[in-house]
Swiss-Prot record:
Cofactor(s) required, per the database record: Mg(2+)
Region (Adenylyl transferase): 449-946
Chain intervals for the UniProt region annotation (Adenylyl removase): 1-440
Enzyme class: transferase
Job of this protein: Involved in the regulation of glutamine synthetase GlnA, a key enzyme in the process to assimilate ammonia. When cellular nitrogen levels are high, the C-terminal adenylyl transferase (AT) inactivates GlnA by covalent transfer of an adenylyl group from ATP to specific tyrosine residue of GlnA, thus reducing its activity. Conversely, when nitrogen levels are low, the N-terminal adenylyl removase (AR) activates GlnA by removing the adenylyl group by phosphorolysis, increasing its activity.
Catalytic activity: [glutamine synthetase]-O(4)-(5'-adenylyl)-L-tyrosine + phosphate = [glutamine synthetase]-L-tyrosine + ADP; [glutamine synthetase]-L-tyrosine + ATP = [glutamine synthetase]-O(4)-(5'-adenylyl)-L-tyrosine + diphosphate
Example GO molecular function: [glutamine synthetase]-adenylyl-L-tyrosine phosphorylase activity
Protein name: Bifunctional glutamine synthetase adenylyltransferase/adenylyl-removing enzyme
Entry's Gene Ontology cellular component terms: cytosol
Highest taxon, organism lineage: Bacteria
Protein's organism: Escherichia coli (strain SMS-3-5 / SECEC)
Family, per entry: Belongs to the GlnE family.
Record-linked InterPro entries: GlnE (IPR023057), GlnE_rpt_dom (IPR005190), NT_sf (IPR043519), PII_UdlTrfase/GS_AdlTrfase (IPR013546)
Amino acid sequence: MKPLSSPLQQYWQTVVERLPEPLADESLSAQAKSVLTFSDFVQDSVIAHPEWLTELESQPPQADEWQHYSAWWQEALSNVSDEAGLMRELRLFRRRIMVRIAWAQTLALVTEESILLQLSHLAETLIVAARDWLYDACCREWGTPCNAQGEAQPLLILGMGKLGGGELNFSSDIDLIFAWPEHGCTQGGRRELDNAQFFTRMGQRLIKVLDQPTQDGFVYRVDMRLRPFGESGPLVLSFAALEDYYQEQGRDWERYAMVKARIMGDSEGVYANELRAMLRPFVFRRYIDFSVIQSLRNMKGMIAREVRRRGLTDNIKLGAGGIREIEFIVQVFQLIRGGREPSLQSRSLLPTLSAIAELHLLSENDAEQLRVAYLFLRRLENLLQSINDEQTQTLPSDELNRARLAWAMDFADWQQLTGALIGHMTNVRRVFNELIGDDESETQEESLSEQWRELWQDALQEDDTTPVLAHLSEDDRKQVLTLIADFRKELDKRTIGPRGRQVLDHLMPHLLRDVCTREDAAVTLSRITALLVGIVTRTTYLELLSEFPAALKHLISLCAASPMIASQLARYPLLLDELLDPNTLYQPTATDAYRDELRQYLLRVPEDDEEQQLEALRQFKQAQLLRIAAADIAGTLPVMKVSDHLTWLAEAMIDAVVQQAWVQMVARYGKPNHLNEREGRGFAVVGYGKLGGWELGYSSDLDLIFLHDCPMDAMTDGEREIDGRQFYLRLAQRIMHLFSTRTSSGILYEVDARLRPSGAAGMLVTSAEAFADYQKNEAWTWEHQALVRARVVYGDPQLTAHFDAVRREIMTLPREGKTLQTEVREMREKMRAHLGNKHRDRFDIKADEGGITDIEFITQYLVLRYAHEKPKLTRWSDNVRILELLAQNDIMEEQEAMALTRAYTTLRDELHHLALQELPGHVPEDCFTAEREQVRVSWQKWLVEE
């Protein structure tokens, strides 16, 4: 045995300090010192189980000891009485045997072929042991699964990949497929289960027993994604379902995977032979199958691009000339000629490589170089993984692990090891390139596009996605891969024609490239895939995004910035047309042009087609809302302007809705006859709250009341004559209907008409005289407060003037200051008790103390308190200009008015942005402390102090 190198002798002193007294004395053999210095995994294991080291020294590992694993397991099984005990013993047995394998491997006591065999046989022993124990337990619990003839049905397990080939890594996942022979039901249990239920439950428990980490670790990481339909498919399939899948839907990569498939355990039983015979025609075609060459060429191109992308010279699996390329070379011949040449049907690589040479498919020299390279790389891979029982194929960058590998591979130093490694990998790459021709040269753009195409088509192995998504955290990377997989599953449920598939396959690599290179890739992708699910069957929209890269770019940036926009686009894909022109997308309609724009838009729709009119109104509103939000996100609209645009848009919609309702009512009943001698409609819509105060948000509803000036004796002049006031009531009802009717484009606005005289108990529409009388004689103080933020948003000039006069008269009434202060304060306290402090350790921007509603109450109180002396205070209905008026009229100091204005606009701005993020209107308790303090000081000054 080669002595430890100088760096490892130094490290041995560190190891000694870790070892407990009995292990640290001079009695340790040179072999033990070498292995404990090389492998932290062995070191940790024998510290926890010193008896294992004694066993290793007295009974060193042998090449053929894998033949005893089953007997040794039977001894361990005597300690098992329940599932928890099974999990514990499996984990301890696996660790004990892995220590023995690591010992033999480090000291080169057995050949590398023996190491691979031992690792694979250990896994098979434990998989079969767990399956058999659980089968008995499940039969006791649910009865024995039987076919129609009453014959017991077993669970068969296909070991895939390196497990199937008897070439398992030291630290490796295991790829499994579960199957059972025939349908039927359980017999002998308390209640009957069909076989599918039985084996699915048993399969779930088997995965848990092997895969679930406990204080003793895990047995193996179990990967079931190679089964038919992958993660979306059943966990366990009947033979009939397997056969149907592979005959009808099996793909080339599944043939590639199935080459190594091996039945675990009793592989010579009747059912095992049946399964094997069923799968063979899928894997090995009877004829020489050159049809597979193109897909093999694609696989080769994938690997080559992966190498170019990252320069993976330090990855002995993925790198140019690495293990994967050797496996690929061998399987090329198996897939093309395996049906005609039984000697090529071996699951293991080295026997197949020998057969390839004997058939003169490769020269003896090339085959020998591949054999030597394979054994060299597999030994290096297993040594690397046995240092920490860690699943890695990347060569270390630290000096200690480099020294360990150089010593174990029998080289003087790291430089000598890497020199030999490069030689072997160069030989592999040469054969690899000669096999189906070198890659055609491709531009950087083509190469870049290809990696995203592979990500979209699920052609990358999980460890291959790192270069593409390297900038993302591990969690985000997993989330992105899950989102892509889930989206593909969703597509499988939809009827997408060949043209749609083609467009999608062209679009998705570009979309993934643009989304996944962002830091917020996972969030953005989740929003966009939700949108795409809604339009995948509508190829026109896919083509729009595919053929107009700028539209795709705008879609991504808007969805990244706002889930609200993403939701709107998902619900109403017609809006995607708005993405085509950035000049209009980020430039909302001029505030005074909304009415004209809407009028022009509605001219496209027949006036007598009510359904299309309703759709057109909603589509116009959504398109304008999108443009406002886009400009808000782009930073071209400050908060005040956002509300201005939203308010002007709402007024344009009110105008159009009243127009439609009026035309429909007049067509049915004629006009009220009091209008014959005058212009106008004798009708007004008053906006309260956010609409009245020019402060609408993205999801604000509309607070409206309806007024008319119809005399008591007026009648309509149509064929269906009705009372004039009844006409206006039906007009108001029609307006409410047009706003609230849900079409495929949703509703227009939520409308709240409860601020009308007598609230919900009052008439929906009120005469101007009755409104004035109510305000003067019946209205509460809070209704006068609401009037501060009220204005006519639609109406005849004379009705508008009448409302303005009533509003001014009410607001300028003399009021006793103390009484008003008490009433306003108590109303606010009631509201706060009802609405505020709902969220522990959060600040509700609108409802909590120091928030927006407090500012609104301060301005309303001051207008009602001082308008009698300063009538100019009644001019505006929005808080910002009211605060300006209070300063100009010497009610409030300018500094305080400006501070409250800043607080108000800051809080409003935050509400807008929370709405864009579809988040509720509350923030952490420590936010906006300065603004809230200013509001509290002003509240105390005006509404508490004498």
